[in-house]
Swiss-Prot record:
The lineage of its organism: Eukaryota, Metazoa, Chordata, Craniata, Vertebrata. This is Homeobox protein Hox-B1. InterPro entries: HD, HD_metazoa, Homeobox_CS, Homeodomain-like_sf, HXA1/B1/D1. Residues 221-280 bind DNA. Pfam families: Homeodomain (PF00046). Belongs to the Antp homeobox family. Labial subfamily. It comes from Cyprinus carpio. SUPFAM superfamilies: Homeodomain-like (SSF46689).
Length: 315
């Protein structure tokens, strides 16, 4: 192996150590800070061996210059308010991946990607940290994940930190406000008094139907057929022959005599006049003028032949 490439190798031990999933060896803590800054110009090589160690090295820069450059980057990191983090995970299948993100606020976000060996999906995890909680190295990060093979959860999981925290906070506040408004409306609706009942609402516009349903289907609405007796029909026919139009006084008198109401007598006379006109058009009945003259002649003859009109024997 080339000596120039061996001078700048970084060794990261990946094992099941709980929260210390991303911890360099002692003496290489300042080199870890250099990863967040600009890298040296050269081709870096990544390799891992069978015991689960990942090696990162460069081959185009001397060891002393590279060490000085990394120390400068570490000193520059002390004055920065936020840095982008690199999360490295290693699984038993030999597949490695890492993700970085620069935060716009002082909070620090760490992103990790885990490949599920059983499914083709990818497990994404992002957690937020504050700069005040970070030390000179990332050994105590609580968001790192390092487990045995097959320990990666099967279901996809996604959690956003950093810039998404403000958005999630605003979204939760907006949702709470909407729920409060909707609950307030429901409360007002429940507490509202019942509607006032006006007098015109109490009036029954449609009187109850007293007619029975016909044997063969329903009849017209609000139509009550009056069944007249033979005596009632005879008296009404006699009255119709004398006068086709009744005065109100005569109508009331006939209704009281026949045990009917005024409306029933009025409607019967209307129907009888329509029936008479229909018969006259068809020629089945004599004209009304001829009938009236015959009735007048008959009345005059009966009056002249009455016993009261005959001369007395004393005269």
């Amino acid at each position: 192996m080339d000596n120039s490439s061996m001078n700048s190798f970084l060794e990261y031990t990946i094992c099941n150590r709980g929260t210390n999933a991303y911890s360099p060896k002692a003496g290489y803590q300042h080199l870890d800070q250099a990863l967040s800054g600009p890298f040296h110009t050269g081709h870096a090589r990544y390799s891992h061996n069978a015991d689960g160690r990942l090696y990162i090295g460069g081959s185009n820069q001397p060891a002393a210059a590279q060490h000085q450059h990394q120390s400068g980057v570490y000193a520059h990191h002390q004055h920065q308010t936020h840095q982008s983090g690199i999360g490295l995970t290693y699984g038993g299948t030999g597949t490695t991946s890492y993700g970085t993100q620069a935060c716009a606020n002082p909070d620090y976000a760490q992103h990790q990607y885990f490949i599920n060996p059983e499914q083709d999906g990818m497990y994404y995890h992002s957690s937020g940290f504050s700069n005040s909680n970070l030390g000179p190295h990332y050994g105590s990060m609580a968001g790192a994940y390092c487990g045995a093979q097959g320990a990666v959860p099967a279901a996809p999981y996604q959690h956003h930190g950093c810039e998404g925290q403000d958005h999630q906070r605003g979204y939760s506040q907006g949702t709470y406000a909407d729920l409060s408004r909707s609950q307030g409306r429901e409360r007002d609706t429940d507490q509202s008094p019942p509607g006032k009942t006006f007098d015109w609402m109490k009036v029954k516009r449609n009187p109850p139907k007293t007619a029975k349903v016909a044997d063969y289907g329903l009849g017209p609405q609000n139509t009550i057929r009056t069944n007249f007796t033979t005596k009632q029909l005879t008296e009404l026919e006699k009255e119709f022959h004398f006068s086709k139009y009744l005065t109100r006084a005569r109508r009331v008198e006939i209704a009281a005599t026949l045990e009917l109401n005024e409306t029933q007598v009025k409607i019967w006379f209307q129907n009888r006049r329509m029936k008479q006109k229909k018969r006259e058009k068809e020629g089945l009945a004599p004209a009304s003028s001829t009938l009236s003259k015959d009735l007048e002649d008959h009345s005059d003859h009966s009056t002249s032949t009455s016993p009261g009109a005959s001369p007395s024997p004393d005269s």
